[in-house]
Amino acid sequence: MSFKYLTLLLATTSVNSFADVDLPSGDDWLNHVTNGLAPYWLMESAHGQPAGNFPTFRCDNGVILDPQKPCEELNKGWISPHFDREYTRMKSRQAYAYGVLFHLTGDKQALELAKKGAYYLIDHLQDEKNGGFVSFTRSGKPGMEWQQRTSQDQAYALVGLAMYYYLTQDPKVEQALIDQQAFIFKQYRRSDDRGLAWVLKDGDGESEKQQELVAQLDQINGYLLLTAPLLPEPAQAKWKQDLEWLTQVMLDNYHSDKEQRFYGAIHHKAVMMPDAKHNDFGHTIKAYWMTYLTGQLLENSNWTEFGFKGMKHTLKQAQYQQNFEQVKALFSPEWQSKWAQESIPAWQSRPYKHYSSSWEWAELDQAAMTVSLVDGSMKETLQYTLPTFMDVWVDHQYGGVGPKAQPTVS
């Protein structure tokens, strides 16, 4: 869920510094949002019962999942065992999406849905007995003991609240944010001070021995950076202090100066290997990006410089040249004609993989835009990768970026 800063970049990406490059215009971005993404999220089936209780599982055409007759795109071995779960993080992410839609277009229906989603999270998915938010429910009941919930789940429960607060400074949402952040940093802070724990008790396939990058990173990305500057004192000072501590933890424990990347986890040598989970360019670029933005917020020039250099190095490593003729079938006729016989820049998730997921592509694009707003160095790449995301990854029939989005592969 790192799209929040994209909304701040869009207003400036297509102006003076990029005037000599054929990048998407403001109208192109609005078309991407209103015609490419919004239809999937504004259809009635997305609103939930009651509105704000957004459904976790919907098919590509927007229909709510029937577990007895699942659509092909959801009938996968890694998804189907969890059809009985309603995930808090999914509801929060959807509330966030409505906030972004309003932020870019002024759509009042989207703002109302963002509010309903935020209020549903607060009113129904907080654990009033133990603190925090439930990770998922089954038949309306919490699915795990509170100590088995991941700190990442606790962070993502706040994504939608953070965006709605960014737009409105709603006092009810403000208090929920302050309470939840305090809960996370009290309960999950490791006794050795090496960051936030993943879980506090083994369960649901997770272990308290795990030390995960995203336990740290997604606090920063999910809510701290967006809302810390808006909070009243003393909460603002406390959040900035925790943000500073967490960023330093990430740099001290998860970054490899030798390999110039972030480890996805550090509890065993195997999880630090380049092909292990979360050891991809997406997580590394996001960690550098968050370090850069944190440096700006806290006026730490060392972090700003470190994050900027890290982004530039990672973007270079993540880019490869793709023969367009091999992938042109994925593109609309406009781009098939415009890029015929060319070799185009593309993003990959790991060295020499020539593959990327939609979220990895988006994060690399966002970092590339950030870099180019400073020195213009990525604009030649962005004139290809931005239209590729809009054209290849978006479902042009029903809207949204779904599980059947196709990567550019050789």
Model-derived segments and spans:
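Sec-dependent signal peptide recognition
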Residues: 1-8
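Short linear sequence elements within intrinsically disordered, low-complexity coil regions
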Residues: 8-10, 170
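N-terminal signal peptide c-region/cleavage motif recognized by signal peptidases
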Residues: 12-16
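Glycan-recognition and catalytic cores of secretory/periplasmic carbohydrate-active enzymes
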Residues: 18-410
